[in-house]
A protein has these predicted regions:
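N-terminal alpha/beta PP-like core and its mobile active-site loop of ThDP/TPP-dependent enzymes
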Residues: 2-264
Length: 264
C-alpha cells in the first residue's frame, strides 16, 4: 500500500492549529474544495455561512474577542470579491483576520479563464497583507507571516490567495507556528537567561544580522557575542559589515538574494 502523502491542504490546517485557530468560517467551492475536504476530516470546527461577507465579519468578531486572527475561507471569483467589505471593515477597525481564497490553476492565470482575477491585487487596499502563493512548500511560512502581520502594530486583515493546483499538491515541509511576539525595550534578566539557555540547548543556532545591526553600538555588541559564543552569522544586505575580518570564520554569507545556499 502506498504511503499517504502530506498534502498542502493539511499543511494549511496544521498551520492554523499551530497558531491557535479553533474555528473556520466560509463557503466551499471548486477551487478551494481540497481544503474544505481536509477540514471535514479534521477537528477544526468548520462553520459554513450563507455569504462570504458574513464569513469575513464573523471572523472579525472572533478577532475582536480573542485578539487572534479569525479565519475565513472562500472559493475563487465572487467568493473572493465578496470578502472585500468584511476585510476592509476589519482593517479599518483594527481587528485581526486571516482570509484564504481559492484561485484558478497557475497555468490558467494568464489565460483569462473563468474566475481568473488577480485576487491579491483586488484585496491589497482592503488589507494589511495580500499575497498569492505559487510554491506549495512555502504555504505554511506565508500563512504564518500573514497572521503575524494581522496582529502587528494596528491589527487588521491579511489575505492569502491559493491556486487550485497549489492547495492540491503534496508537500514535504512541516507546518510552522508563530515565533514569540517580540518585546520592545530592555529585556529582563529572566528573558536574557531564557535566550542563553535556548542557545545552549539548540542544535543549529544561527545569528541573523539585519538592518538595525550595522550601527556602531549594535555592531560592537554582536561582535562580542560572536567571540564569546562562536555562533555562525548570516546577514541581510543591510547588515553588511557587521562581521569583521577577524571573525570571518563565523560568517556564512548573506540571505535574500542570489540563492546563496550556505546562508539560506
Amino acid at each position: 500500500m502506498a504511503e499517504k502523502q502530506y498534502s498542502a491542504a493539511q499543511m494549511v490546517i496544521d498551520t492554523l492549529k499551530n497558531n491557535g485557530v479553533e474555528y473556520v468560517f466560509g463557503i466551499p467551492g471548486a477551487k478551494i474544495d481540497y481544503l474544505f475536504n481536509a477540514l471535514e476530516d479534521d477537528d477544526l470546527e468548520l462553520v459554513v455561512t450563507r455569504h462570504e461577507q458574513n464569513a469575513a465579519m464573523i471572523a472579525q468578531g472572533i478577532g475582536r474577542l480573542t485578539g487572534k486572527p479569525g479565519v475565513a475561507i472562500t472559493t475563487s471569483g465572487p467568493g473572493v470579491s465578496n470578502l472585500t467589505t468584511g476585510l476592509l471593515t476589519a482593517t479599518s477597525e483594527g481587528d485581526p483576520v486571516l482570509a484564504i481564497g481559492g484561485q484558478v490553476k497557475r497555468n490558467d492565470l494568464l489565460r483569462l479563464t473563468h474566475q481568473s482575477i488577480d485576487n491579491a491585487s483586488l484585496l491589497r487596499s482592503s488589507t494589511k497583507y495580500s499575497a498569492e502563493v505559487q510554491d506549495p512548500e512555502s504555504l505554511s511560512e506565508v500563512i504564518t507571516n500573514a497572521m503575524r502581520t494581522a496582529t502587528s502594530g494596528k491589527n487588521g486583515a491579511s489575505f492569502i490567495s491559493i491556486p487550485q493546483d497549489v492547495i492540491s499538491s503534496p508537500v514535504k515541509a512541516d507546518a510552522i507556528s508563530l515565533c514569540q511576539k517580540p518585546h520592545l525595550g530592555v529585556p529582563s534578566e529572566q528573558e536574557i537567561n531564557e535566550v542563553i539557555e535556548a542557545i545552549k540547548n539548540s542544535k543549529f543556532p544561527v545569528l541573523l544580522a539585519g538592518m538595525r545591526s550595522s550601527s556602531q553600538a549594535e555592531t560592537e555588541a554582536i561582535r562580542r557575542l560572536v567571540q564569546k559564543t562562536n555562533l555562525p552569522v548570516v546577514e541581510t544586505f543591510q547588515g553588511a559589515g557587521v562581521i569583521s575580518r577577524e571573525l570571518e570564520n563565523h560568517f556564512f554569507g548573506r540571505v535574500g538574494l542570489f540563492r546563496n545556499q550556505v546562508g539560506d
